[in-house]
């Protein structure tokens, strides 16, 4: 099984330095950059997220795809930063333009959605959120089995795909891995959900995700740092990724969604040792 052993390089603009006190003295410390990114569709503002600069176009594409606003890259003509280099705020606004003969219509897609705050004390709201998502996400088919060795290889690739974290200790990471263990895309960000949007967007551009993607080239695994929450499983299900693995625990709502969406959910992955919270049969296991 092929794995990526080469460490990734940090993207430009992802690290800043500040003077801090350490052991009674002043030193320069590397920090992860956090800045707002406004996502527009055909010039109209849709959303703003706090992110680490880098792969902004992929972030925008992945976000729109996960929300069902675009069906694939065929809907998109251009993805560009607004403004001019040197202007205040340049690089923090991304405009996604419809392809010729197409019209991306967020209002039509989002109309009638139940935007219900979900919290640990709101089990009913959580259930409604899952039911609503499953109205537009079909459960993933069982498909080909995925060996636990692939999960272990994916987590190894994840560990080697965090150059900014190595310098700052302040970022999350995500990586998509194919069935052969080779990385499809990797990204870091201050927001775990942003990192996932970035790798999904990159896979969309590469033709590895989306309605026209060949099953043989589609990613088999999404590996993430930290915990696997509801949003992470949602994005994996939307992208058709059958296995999600994290170094930490999932949330209860993430487990519920994974079981409904046919996503295999693994947590506390240490080599080939892990907890499997949903659809373990895909890994050749019996249980949840």
Curated annotation (Swiss-Prot):
- The residues that cross the membrane are none
Name one molecular function that GO assigns to this entry.
sulfur carrier activity
Name any Gene Ontology BP term.
Mo-molybdopterin cofactor biosynthetic process
> Would the keyword Cytoplasm be found if you checked this record's keyword annotation?
yes
Where is Mo-bis(molybdopterin guanine dinucleotide) bound in this sequence?
Answer: 268-273
Pfam name, any one: FdhD-NarQ
Any single GO CC term annotated in Swiss-Prot or TrEMBL for this entry: cytoplasm
UniProt keyword annotations, A-Z: Cytoplasm, Molybdenum cofactor biosynthesis
- Residues the record marks as active site: 122 (cysteine persulfide intermediate)
Q: Does the keyword Cell inner membrane apply?
A: no
Tell me where it resides: Cytoplasm
Biological role stated in the UniProt entry: Required for formate dehydrogenase (FDH) activity. Acts as a sulfur carrier protein that transfers sulfur from IscS to the molybdenum cofactor prior to its insertion into FDH.
**Assigned protein family:** Belongs to the FdhD family.
PANTHER family in alphabetical order: FORMATE DEHYDROGENASE, SULFUR CARRIER PROTEIN FDHD
User: What name does UniProt use for this protein?
Assistant: Sulfur carrier protein FdhD
